[in-house]
């Protein structure tokens, strides 16, 4: 069997005006050997061909397309190289000659320059007309040639020249507009670079040649070429182009990175987990291509009508000449002019483009916002949605469970043994609850052994089963009891407050254990619900969790749900979706897991959580949410409604323009040049109107990135987001404050970190362990105040709300030392020695009372961050950069952090500042009333951090 080498090639085909050229391209490509499949995307004037390069080259395809005068050229590596930046020489020369012909009023021989203008500009139109006739097709080029010929025959040379010039220049403008409309999508499809660097050798290779489990290197500023897992190093990654995430995402060892995202800082090595063609960005591009090539119901209707429109108009125009000629009317020239106006109006390009261009722009906007809509029909249906149903776990809630309590109910089974059986069985499940149980087991020194589990089974909506050490173990909700052979679940005193999820463990037919898990709602969910309500859309929650957990989520969201159904099996969800479709109308279902797949498939629109969701959910969903921010859902519905309005506007523009020209002609003013201008001008207006979908209706501030520093810097940053303080969605609240600087207070601009204070002169060990020297470290507190105020010693200032006293930046020093015998710590600080910083004190001036901050325990890698919980609602993120501390920065561990305060606080916090920083803004900043070192603190008002002592 002959070998094959299949390649996907992209071609820019500027000769595509509307869908009427698609059959021509199909006939050309179908007649060529080596073509496996192809698609034609009319709005972007793109042809995508999968072909065998051993049989058919790209240049052979270009040659075949250009024989039909389609102006095709190869697009290199999926990028758009627009070649018509300027009008063609034919149009330029024709325009100059036409302009000179108007001097005929001064010197009559100049009128012949109009004929020269026709000759100069007609060639490309004539060539396309001949190519169309050769294939027995009637298009706008043939109609224009006939019109120009008839006009010259009537000695209207100037009008003929105007027709030729307007047609050529308008086509150029249309191609420019089409390029602008498709440029965003082309950049999306060419996100991933074509080359990668092998970490071990430094060799640069083609991405297509990379195999899985190859370790590659990615430097700061480079685009990650392929999906993988970080092996070494850490960095921040800009995932905006892929997920719509507004802020950089920190990546540490074992973090997943995606092709097409940008490494903003740091050096990482990545172990590849997919081939180039199987990367998320490649699948994303394929889905977008398929969606662009699909048609809405409206578009199919218009295309069907256009098949009859052109022949009917041509027949009418012939009648306008034939009937007056047969009747020998005295003003035959008027009727010929009228017939030519009608003839030029026979091309319905503007009407045909009205739907696909608007759809194309909407799909492009969605894709660049982290929403993949798999087809044009789904976009049209999305605009009609009346009710949205949500799964709870992993969709409304984070799906990041924590085991709060685990009990053994059998005297014959120890807690250690039960936890071993449960965690070993759960380690074979992909459910987020399973991961929480496994983590809990390891935290109490129980190591699961999944290889010891036999006959593992999953029961969707109920639980799992596995056989281990001869024991049959069932784990799940109440329904799992029937699988274990029990008819009912005994009443057990289990804490279900706070919406905890209860899990039951059966060993054989005996209820051997019970555990509860806690989960929390995602940030932004309440906002998403509010926006859906404002659109007149009802909301339902369908969950397999217990009623208590479901109602707790309902309470957290302010009773936003119109319908709440709990303890549902997958088939129950599907039946409820059918019921909602009958009673409410078009229904959307949002889910992320295996249990949601039937409901996603049943709904009119299935929306799956893409990158985080299961593979099956992603395949089942009609729309893929690339991030976990469900605020994208109301955005998608708004976009679909805007696209629907644009389609209506485009149709109205097309019909109105044609109707106006015909009405003018029948009123006694048959202007042929106006008819041509209306035809090509309508196409241009339709494209420009549709491009408004690509613009952001609500402008946001510029995104800014934290500057990395080679020195040891600790950044304490205020998190302003949802009430939960969650930065996961990457979107800050839109707060308008006249005292705020541009980009602050809810926008995305951050201030630059200050330079570190002068460090110790001895850097042999950076002040760590063996020498016990101290390093100076700068802490920068970011704020949203209008202007820095440098006050002298002993001066007090108010919060940000004060007119003249605004916190700006905070500089403190961190002292680090190592103890020879740290209490309760196993790992050393540097070089593996048993010297570990184990306690930190934060002295914060101007607090009435000490505020406890819990930042968790465990190693803090360079570049890692942790959430600091203040008293009340406020939260802060502590960013750790420890380049200068240890040769092995991963050994630096933070075990506790205490806040000290003095009694100088004169609370003067304004309500606006409390809005920014929680229930008490003095927890974020303190009043300045303390002495300084050689440099003043340029951050006054609410809370100057004074000293962090690492002992």
UniProtKB/Swiss-Prot annotation:
It is a multi-pass membrane protein. It is found in: Cell membrane. Signal peptide: none annotated. Residues 1-83, 129-135, 179-304, 354-647, 692-951 are cytoplasmic. The active site is at 391 (4-aspartylphosphate intermediate). Its EC number is 7.2.2.12, 7.2.2.21. Mg(2+) binds at residues 592, 596. GO terms for cellular component: plasma membrane. Gene3D superfamilies: 3.30.70.100, Calcium-transporting ATPase, cytoplasmic domain N, Calcium-transporting ATPase, cytoplasmic transduction domain A, HAD superfamily/HAD-like. Residues 106-108, 157, 328-335, 668-671 are extracellular. Belongs to the cation transport ATPase (P-type) (TC 3.A.3) family. Type IB subfamily. This is Cadmium/zinc-transporting ATPase HMA2. The gene is HMA2.
């Amino acid at each position: 069997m002959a070998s094959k080498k299949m390649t996907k090639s992209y071609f820019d085909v500027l000769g595509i005006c509307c869908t009427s050229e698609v059959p021509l391209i199909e006939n050309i490509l179908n007649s060529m050997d080596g073509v496996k499949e192809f698609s034609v995307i009319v709005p972007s004037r793109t042809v995508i061909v999968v072909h065998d390069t051993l049989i058919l080259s790209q240049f052979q395809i270009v040659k075949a397309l250009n024989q039909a005068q389609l102006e095709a050229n190869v697009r290199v590596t999926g990028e758009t190289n627009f070649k018509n930046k300027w009008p063609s020489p034919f149009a330029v020369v024709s325009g100059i000659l036409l302009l000179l012909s108007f001097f005929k009023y001064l010197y009559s021989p100049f009128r012949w320059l109009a004929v020269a203008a026709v000759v100069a500009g007609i060639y490309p139109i004539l060539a396309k007309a001949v190519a169309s006739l050769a294939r027995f097709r009637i298009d706008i080029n043939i109609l224009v040639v006939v019109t120009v010929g008839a006009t010259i025959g009537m000695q209207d040379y100037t009008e003929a020249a105007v027709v030729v010039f307007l047609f050529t220049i308008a086509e150029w403008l249309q191609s420019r507009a089409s390029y602008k409309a498709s440029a965003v999508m082309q950049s999306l499809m060419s996100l991933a670079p074509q080359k990668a660097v092998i970490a071990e050798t430094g060799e640069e290779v083609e991405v297509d040649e990379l195999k899985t489990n190859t370790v590659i290197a990615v430097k700061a500023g480079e685009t990650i070429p392929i999906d993988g897992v970080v092996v070494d190093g850490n960095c921040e990654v800009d995932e905006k182009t892929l997920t719509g995430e507004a802020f950089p995402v920190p990546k540490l060892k074992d973090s997943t990175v995606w092709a097409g995202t940008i490494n903003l800082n740091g050096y990482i090595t990545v172990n590849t987990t997919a081939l180039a063609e199987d990367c998320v960005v490649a699948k994303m591009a394929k889905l977008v291509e398929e969606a662009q090539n699909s048609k809405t119901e409206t578009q199919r209707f218009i295309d069907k009508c256009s098949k009859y429109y052109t022949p009917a108009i041509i027949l009418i125009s012939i009648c306008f000449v034939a009937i007056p000629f047969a009747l020998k009317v005295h003003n035959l020239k008027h009727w010929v002019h009228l017939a030519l106006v009608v003839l030029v109006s026979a091309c319905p390009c503007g009407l045909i483009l009205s739907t696909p261009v608007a759809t194309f722009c909407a799909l492009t906007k969605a894709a660049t916002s982290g929403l993949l809509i798999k087809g044009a029909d789904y976009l049209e249906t999305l605009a009609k949605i009346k009710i949205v149903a949500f799964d709870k776990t992993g969709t409304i809630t984070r799906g990041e469970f924590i085991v709060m309590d685990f009990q053994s109910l059998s005297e014959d089974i120890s807690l250690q043994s039960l936890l071993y059986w449960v965690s070993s069985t759960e380690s074979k499940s992909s459910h987020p609850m399973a991961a929480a149980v496994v983590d809990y087991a390891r935290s109490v020194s129980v190591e699961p052994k999944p290889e010891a589990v036999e006959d593992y089974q999953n029961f969707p909506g109920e639980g799992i089963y596995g056989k281990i050490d001869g024991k049959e173990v069932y784990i799940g909700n109440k329904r799992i009891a029937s699988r274990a052979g029990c008819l009912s679940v005994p009443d057990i005193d289990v804490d279900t407050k706070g919406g905890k999820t209860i899990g039951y463990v059966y060993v054989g037919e005996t209820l051997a254990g019970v555990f509860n898990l806690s989960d929390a709602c995602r940030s932004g969910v309440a906002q998403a619900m509010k926006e859906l309500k404002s659109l007149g859309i009802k909301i339902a929650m369908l969950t397999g969790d217990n009623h208590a957990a479901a109602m707790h989520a309902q309470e957290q969201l302010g009773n936003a749900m119109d319908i709440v159904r709990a303890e549902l099996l997958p088939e129950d969800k599907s039946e409820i979706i059918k019921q909602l479709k009958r009673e409410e109308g078009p229904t959307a279902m949002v889910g992320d897991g295996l249990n949601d797949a039937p409901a996603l498939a049943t709904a009119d629109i299935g929306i799956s959580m893409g990158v985080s969701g299961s593979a099956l959910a992603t395949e089942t969903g009609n729309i893929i949410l690339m991030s976990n921010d469900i605020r994208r859902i109301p955005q998608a519905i708004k976009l679909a409604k805007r696209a629907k309005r644009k389609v209506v506007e485009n149709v109205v523009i097309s019909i109105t323009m044609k109707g106006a020209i015909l009405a003018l002609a029948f009123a006694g003013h048959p202007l042929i040049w106006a008819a041509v201008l209306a035809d090509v001008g309508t196409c241009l207006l339709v494209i420009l109107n549709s491009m408004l979908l690509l613009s952001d209706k609500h402008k946001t501030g510029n995104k800014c990135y934290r500057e990395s520093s080679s020195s040891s810097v600790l950044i304490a940053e205020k998190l302003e987001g949802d009430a939960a303080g969650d930065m996961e969605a990457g979107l800050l609240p839109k707060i308008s404050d006249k005292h705020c600087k541009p980009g602050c207070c809810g926008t995305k601009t951050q201030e630059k970190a200050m330079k570190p204070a002068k460090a110790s002169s001895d850097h042999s060990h950076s002040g760590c362990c063996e020498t016990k020297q101290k390093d100076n470290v700068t802490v920068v507190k970011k704020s949203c105040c209008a202007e820095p105020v440098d006050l002298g010693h002993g001066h007090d200032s108010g919060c940000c709300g004060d007119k003249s006293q605004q916190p700006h930046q905070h500089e403190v020093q961190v002292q680090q030392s190592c103890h020879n015998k740290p209490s309760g710590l196993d790992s050393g600080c540097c070089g593996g020695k048993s010297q570990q910083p184990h306690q930190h004190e934060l002295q914060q001036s101007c607090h009435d009372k000490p505020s406890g901050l819990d930042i968790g325990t465990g190693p803090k890698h360079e570049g890692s961050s942790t959430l600091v919980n203040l008293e009340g609602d406020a939260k802060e993120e502590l960013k750790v950069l420890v380049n200068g501390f240890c040769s092995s920065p991963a050994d630096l561990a933070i075990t506790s952090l205490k806040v000290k305060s003095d009694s100088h606080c004169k609370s003067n916090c304004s309500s606006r500042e409390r809005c920014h920083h929680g229930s008490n803004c003095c927890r974020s900043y303190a009043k300045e009333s303390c002495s300084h070192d050689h440099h003043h603190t340029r951050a006054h008002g609410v809370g100057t951090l004074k000293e962090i002592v690492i002992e």
